């Protein structure tokens, strides 16, 4: 997949940042060191510094564009290019022997194939706390329509099957992480965001969940000049406008998030 766009991702930074604040608020212990898995453009680092000003921090992300943006925005921070699976296996920039008191991740693990099976290994890299949130909206109209439109002609031959990301319910995450010596707090929240402007749901999902589809269409257009991306945006945008009608105050978007905080017992 082509790289992410930090600018597009940050268009709704307040709405995207809110779950991270809720996640951080549920961390009970004070870490001396923090690893942020999937740190993105570094826009959430201030929340960590504000909560734990003396902690050492490392942000990891698999996107070169995101790491470049994070380093430019926060030159005093440490941001490294790394894959979540490498970190779980102890092959990343943070040696397994060093670990971190807090390993935290916001809206990243849903992109990792087999992330449910990877959770115990990720938790093992945390000396005190492993905390994460993932979007739980993959059955929402936005994502269902993405699969339907992308799965129809003429897009399906270009983008291939659109995967439904395997995100579990809070009870499932509790079951996976509740090993001896761990205390787990798992919950879910549905936010109702009010998005301004024209086609805001299309702009929202185009920066995140629709990325694999859009990158495939853009690559095809670059090679063949077919204009499939514009046609897809028109068809998908029309379906989203019907599913998420604009009101006088903006366009409401219900967005479910699932959280888990696993803490080693004292």
Where are each of the predicted segments found?
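Conserved class I S-adenosyl-L-methionine
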Residues: 1-31, 43-47, 66-69, 86, ...
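Local beta-strand N-terminus motif with an aromatic residue
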Residues: 31, 99-101, 127
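Class I SAM-dependent methyltransferase SAM/SAH-binding core
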Residues: 35-37, 41-92
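Conserved Class I S-adenosyl-L-methionine
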Residues: 41-43, 166-266
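A short acidic, Gly/Pro-enriched loop at the edge of an enzyme's catalytic core
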Residues: 90-102
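A short SAM/SAH-binding and catalytic strip from SAM-dependent methyltransferases
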Residues: 102-115, 136
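Conserved catalytic/acceptor-binding region of the Class I
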Residues: 116, 127-197, 212
């Amino acid at each position: 997949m082509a790289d992410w766009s930090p600018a597009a991702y940050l268009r709704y930074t307040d709405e995207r940042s809110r779950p991270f604040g809720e996640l951080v608020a549920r961390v009970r212990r004070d870490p001396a060191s923090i690893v942020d898995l999937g740190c993105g453009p570094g826009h959430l680092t201030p929340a960590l510094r504000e909560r734990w000003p003396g902690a050492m921090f490392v942000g990891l992300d698999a996107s070169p564009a995101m790491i470049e943006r994070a380093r430019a925005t926060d030159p005093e921070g440490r941001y490294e290019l790394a894959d979540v699976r490498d970190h779980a296996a102890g092959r990343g920039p943070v040696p397994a022997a060093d670990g971190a008191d807090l390993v935290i991740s916001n809206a990243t693990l849903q992109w990792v194939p087999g992330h449910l099976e990877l959770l115990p290994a990720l938790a093992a890299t945390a000396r005190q706390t492993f905390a994460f949130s993932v979007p739980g909206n993959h059955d929402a109209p936005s994502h269902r329509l993405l699969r339907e439109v992308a799965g129809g002609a003429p897009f399906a031959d270009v983008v291939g099957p659109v995967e439904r990301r395997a995100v579990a319910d809070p009870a499932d995450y509790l079951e996976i992480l509740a090993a001896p010596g761990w205390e787990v707090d798992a919950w879910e929240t549905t936010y109702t965001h009010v998005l301004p402007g024209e086609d805001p749901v299309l702009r929202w999902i185009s920066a995140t969940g629709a990325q694999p589809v859009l990158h495939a269409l853009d690559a095809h257009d670059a090679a063949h000049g077919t204009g499939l991306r514009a046609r897809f945006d028109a068809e998908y945008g029309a379906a989203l406008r019907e599913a998420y009608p604009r009101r006088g105050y903006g366009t409401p978007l219900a967005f479910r998030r699932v959280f888990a905080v696993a803490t080693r017992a004292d």
